[in-house]
Design a protein with these regions (language model features):
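Conserved donor-binding/catalytic core segment of Leloir-type glycosyltransferases
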Residues: 5-7, 177, 183-205, 211-214
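Glycosyltransferase donor-sugar binding loop
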Residues: 39-46, 200, 223-235, 250
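Donor nucleotide-sugar binding/catalytic pocket of nucleotide-sugar-dependent glycosyltransferases
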Residues: 133-135, 142-178
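Nucleotide-activated donor-binding/catalytic signature segment of Leloir-type glycosyltransferases, i.e.
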Residues: 234-252
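Short alpha-helical segment that forms part of, or immediately flanks, the ligand-binding pocket
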Residues: 258, 281-286, 300-302
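Acidic donor-binding loop of glycosyltransferase active sites
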Residues: 259-276, 289
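Conserved acidic donor-binding segment of nucleotide-sugar-dependent glycosyltransferases
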Residues: 306-316, 324-329
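A charged, aromatic-enriched C-terminal amphipathic alpha-helix characteristic of glycosyltransferases
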Residues: 330-361
C-alpha cells in the first residue's frame, strides 16, 4: 500500500509549547506503516514589531519526534515581522527545503489569520488547525479546519471561517503510564490538602485569582504547588505571605509533570485570557483531579472542565469552591470520578488520533 505523504510546518516547531507539542504528538502518533511524515521547523527567531520571545528548540522534543519515526527537516528564519499582516519570515531558506508537490496533505498549526508561508501554499490539500480565537479565513485548498472548542469554532466562523469545513477535535495530549511518585513526602505535606496549577512562565497570562482565593482559605492543613508560573505568581505569594506555597521549575520531562500532578488534590486553574483547549487541564483530568477555574475572555476551560468541577466569576467564589472541595467529601469524590470519565471518553489521545487519521484518509480517497 502506498503511504500517505504528510508535511507538518511550524515556526519554532520543536519548542516545548502548546501548539508545537500538539503538532509533534500528531506527527509522532501517526502509524508509520501508513504515513510518511516530514516535520519542517526552525529555531526561534527575534520578532520585529513585538517584544514577544517565542520558545526555542527543545532538545528533548527533537529526540521525542525522532524516536517516533518523524523525519525532521530544519530550515532557517532570521526574523519574524509582525509589522506585516501575514507575519512574514525575513531571510528564510524555507523554500529551498519545501515543495508542496511532494506531499498528499499538509498539516498546519497557527493563529487563524492569513500567514506566511501558507499564503503561498495553494495546491496541496491542507488540514489546518487554529489555536487562537477570533480570526478566520476561507482558503480554497484547506480541506478541513480543526478547532479545539465549540466557543473557538463560533468565533472562527464569525471571523470568516467556513462552517462546513470546521471540525472540533480536542488537543491530543500524550499521557504515558506513570507511577505514584509525588512531592508529598519530600515537602512534608502528608497531612495537607494540596491545590496546584501548571503554567508557562508568561506574565501576559498571569491571573491573580487562584492565589488570591487561596489567601482566603489557607491554613496549616493546606498547600499550593505551582509548576512553572511567572514572576507575578512568586511576587503575589510573597506579598500575601502565603503559607505552604512552593514553585517548581518549568520542565518538559513527562515524569516530573506527572510527579507534580500526583501531589495535588485539586487542580486550581487560572489564566487571564482564558483557554481554548488546555493541555494542562487535560493532564489534570487524566489524574482524576477535580477542577476549579474562573471566567475570562476565552472560555474553553468551561467546556473542558464540565462536571469535573466549576468555573466561577471571581476570587471570592473561587475560595468558596476551595472550601467545598476540602470539607464536602461527597462533592470532591463526585468531581474526581467525573474528571476520570471525561478524560477517558473525550481526551484520551488514541481516540483523538483516530479522528485525525480519518481526516487524512478522506483527503486522499
Amino acid at each position: 500500500m502506498k503511504k500517505i505523504k504528510i508535511a507538518f510546518i511550524k515556526f519554532g516547531g520543536m519548542a516545548n509549547g502548546g501548539t508545537e507539542k500538539y503538532l509533534q504528538t500528531i506527527a509522532s502518533y501517526l502509524p508509520k506503516d501508513e504515513f510518511e511524515v516530514d516535520f519542517f521547523y526552525c529555531d526561534s527567531a527575534p520578532y520585529i514589531g513585538s517584544d514577544f520571545v517565542h520558545p526555542d528548540t527543545d532538545a528533548s522534543r527533537v529526540e521525542y519526534c525522532k524516536s517516533h519515526g518523524v523525519n525532521l527537516i530544519k530550515f532557517n528564519v532570521e526574523f519574524k515581522d509582525l509589522r506585516t499582516h501575514t507575519h512574514d519570515w525575513v531571510n528564510t531558506d524555507f523554500w529551498e527545503y519545501f515543495n508542496e508537490d511532494n506531499y498528499d496533505v499538509i498539516q498546519l498549526g497557527r493563529a487563524g489569520h492569513p500567514e506566511y508561508p501558507f499564503i503561498h501554499i495553494n495546491k496541496t490539500p491542507i488540514i489546518d488547525s487554529i489555536h487562537l480565537a477570533g480570526m478566520g479565513e476561507d482558503k480554497s485548498n484547506v480541506y478541513k479546519t480543526v478547532l479545539i472548542s465549540e466557543e473557538q469554532k463560533s468565533k472562527w466562523v464569525a471571523a470568516g471561517g467556513d462552517p462546513n469545513k470546521g471540525v472540533i477535535i480536542p488537543v491530543p495530549v500524550e499521557v504515558p503510564d506513570y507511577d505514584t511518585t509525588s512531592y508529598i513526602e519530600e515537602f512534608g505535606w502528608e497531612d495537607k490538602f494540596v491545590f496546584g496549577m501548571h503554567q508557562r512562565d508568561d506574565i501576559h497570562i498571569f491571573s491573580p485569582v487562584p492565589l488570591e482565593a487561596y489567601d482566603d482559605i489557607q491554613s496549616d492543613d493546606t498547600a499550593f504547588l505551582i509548576l512553572g508560573g511567572s514572576s507575578n505568581h512568586r511576587k503575589q505569594a510573597k506579598d500575601y505571605g502565603l503559607k505552604n506555597v512552593k514553585f517548581l521549575d518549568t520542565t518538559s520531562e513527562i515524569p516530573l509533570i506527572h510527579k507534580f500532578l500526583n501531589t495535588l488534590n485539586v487542580y486550581a486553574h487560572g489564566r487571564s485570557d482564558g483557554e481554548q483547549c488546555s493541555s494542562a487541564i487535560i493532564e489534570g483530568l487524566s489524574h482524576s483531579l477535580p477542577m476549579i477555574s474562573h471566567t475570562a475572555p476565552s472560555m474553553g476551560q468551561l467546556e473542558q472542565i464540565g462536571d469535573a468541577g466549576v468555573v466561577v466569576d471571581g476570587y471570592e467564589e473561587y475560595a468558596q469552591v476551595m472550601k467545598n472541595m476540602i470539607h464536602n467529601k461527597n462533592y470532591y469524590v463526585e468531581c474526581k470520578l467525573n474528571a476520570s470519565k471525561r478524560y477517558k471518553e473525550i481526551y484520551d489521545v488514541s481516540s483523538i488520533m483516530k479522528k485525525f487519521i480519518e481526516l487524512y484518509r478522506e483527503v486522499v480517497s
